[in-house]
Amino acid sequence: MFGARFDPTADDSSSDESEEESEEEENENENVVNNDVAKDIDSVESEESEDSDHSNDPNDAMDVDSEVNTEVDVDYVSKYKSVFDKFKKSVPETKKIDSESSSEEEDDVEMQDLMPLPQPALPRDKRLISSNSHLKNLDWLATPIYASPEDSKPFSEFEISPFLLKNLERDNFTTAFSVQIAIMDILLHDIKRNRLEPDVKGDILVNAATGSGKTLAYSIPIIEALHNRVVPRVRAIVLVPTKPLINQVKATFVQLSRGTNLSVVSLRNDVSIKEEGIKIVNSPPDIIVSTPGRLVEHISNKSINLNSLQFLVIDEADRLLNQSFQNWCQVLISSLEGDVNIAEEWKITPQKLIFSATLTTDSGKLSALKFQKPRLVIVNDRKQLVNEIFNVPSSLSEYTIQFGTAKASIKPLILAKYLLENNKLSNVLIFTKSNEASIRLCKLLELMFGKLHPSMNIAYINSTNNKSAIRTKILKDFSTQKINILVATDLIARGIDILSITDVINYDLPNSSREYVHRVGRTARANQTGHAYTLCFGKGEAKWFKKIISDVGRGDKTIEKVEIELKELIVAEDENVYNECLESLSKQVFH
């Protein structure tokens, strides 16, 4: 086949034959195809003629059997005539559309800024409400429940069981104070309603001055709610920041639950966590009093089951929320919110009770507790809400004693002489800034009173002698006046609950409004009268004291300034005694 391309004779003969064949084919086609079809396929035939001319090329010997091909093409066209008719009609329309689009493209395009196009508002299904929507609602912070500090009411007027009234009277509790009235009215109503409606009752946050009776405010309703229980399970947990508070709270629950089968347990760090966990598993208590760290350890070891918990009390909440030991808050709350199949087990939502004398309203801190339907109760005459709520007892009288910086060198002597001149020789609590300062002041006062008033007994308490046995003995001796003056630090300020304290003296200024409130709150407890004195030496200390007391609520009362004439208070003989005591103290320290 390819050899024919290079044979001139073959090329000439083939070209002549192809011309004759093409003429015969055209004649045959005219006879076969009718006139109507011929008109419709003129364009197709013209293309075929061009193909036949191309076949005359001497170099192209590929097209043989042209007769067969032509017959196939004619049959193809005849068969799909309707398709070709539609094609012919669409060609002019396509040209028209192309011309219109080209003219539109030539039109000027309007320039637009580079900005997002406006979008329609997304539809909202108001029927779908988040189950956590209450966490975002902080209206309860702006609408607290205020209670007057002067309110009082006999316990016999509350709807509580006879055994509770009997136990209260045995401990000489006959009248409820303001915070107890406010909280008991709410909790007792919730408890009564919950017996028929086991729904979420709502959490309670309480801001009341230290010493106002917060422990009784939550312990009485808890005992009332649990005393008829049948199966012992962990139903109430009370969290406090220190060991002394654990002992005090536990003692209150034990006294109030006399005559019932309720079991009260305190978690202690001086006992093996494993042994303590085994006891709890074998004999579940009804009420647990603990520090957050110890409780988290038991939760991690799964020795405490929280499925039956009804009450979670956080006492001294401001201090506990500032602690991040073992991330206790997140661990505890996540354990309470564990997934439970309610088809198989009914889980009660525990009611959270938050108490503090310096309650924070910082939503960032409070949100970690994940409140449900919270209510804020403030025991204060001043109906004002600030970021930190600080209140002192209404029965407290506050004083400030100010001197120039030059007199700071005889500060211990001024204190000793003022106590002697004003007959404040017992039930006096003095606060210093550090362990070293408390020990030094205690020793110096012992030496001075040994020469000025020999019958005085002075002691100190701080983190260096804060073991349970030593601490218990010191506080007991102080409450029975075997110790006349006690020098302490801020670290243990919240653990002292002695009703007999009449005077608190801030020998060193507190670091914040919160510490000031907790210091002076050691007196004027349970609506008894009390006095707080603050020593300021120099303009700097006076300015700082003015700043920290500006945020403290005290009703209509003000801080009185005590005017003292040093020439009348201190004589030359007193200064000689003071210098001798300083020399004696230095010998004790360095020898």
Curated annotation (Swiss-Prot):
Entry binding sites for ATP: A208, A209, T210, G211, S212, G213, K214, T215
Compositional bias annotation for Acidic residues: 9-29, 60-70
Keywords per UniProt: ATP-binding, Helicase, Hydrolase, Nucleotide-binding, Nucleus, Ribosome biogenesis, RNA-binding, rRNA processing
Any one Gene Ontology BP term: maturation of 5.8S rRNA from tricistronic rRNA transcript (SSU-rRNA, 5.8S rRNA, LSU-rRNA)
Positions of the UniProt region annotated as Disordered: 1-70
Subcellular location: Nucleus, Nucleolus
Motif range (DEAD box): 315-318
EC annotation from Swiss-Prot or TrEMBL: 3.6.4.13
Annotated InterPro entries: DEAD/DEAH_box_helicase_dom (IPR011545), DEAD_box_RNA_helicase (IPR050079), Helicase_ATP-bd (IPR014001), Helicase_C-like (IPR001650), P-loop_NTPase (IPR027417), RNA-helicase_DEAD-box_CS (IPR000629)
GO cellular component, one term: cytosol
Record-annotated Helicase C-terminal domain positions: 414-570
PROSITE patterns in the record: DEAD_ATP_HELICASE, HELICASE_ATP_BIND_1, HELICASE_CTER, Q_MOTIF
UniProt GO molecular function: ATP binding; ATP hydrolysis activity; RNA binding; RNA helicase activity
Domain named Helicase ATP-binding: residues: 195-377
Motif (Q motif): 153-181
Reaction it catalyzes: ATP + H2O = ADP + phosphate + H(+)
Enzyme category, top tier: hydrolase
Keyword ATP-binding assigned: yes
SMART domains from the UniProt entry: DEXDc, HELICc
Subunit structure: Associated with pre-ribosomal particles.
Domain commentary: The Q motif is unique to and characteristic of the DEAD box family of RNA helicases and controls ATP binding and hydrolysis.
Family: Belongs to the DEAD box helicase family. DDX51/DBP6 subfamily.
Reported function: ATP-binding RNA helicase involved in the biogenesis of 60S ribosomal subunits and is required for the normal formation of 25S and 5.8S rRNAs.
Protein name: ATP-dependent RNA helicase DBP6
Species the sequence originates in: Scheffersomyces stipitis (strain ATCC 58785 / CBS 6054 / NBRC 10063 / NRRL Y-11545) (Yeast)
Upper lineage: Eukaryota, Fungi, Dikarya, Ascomycota, Saccharomycotina
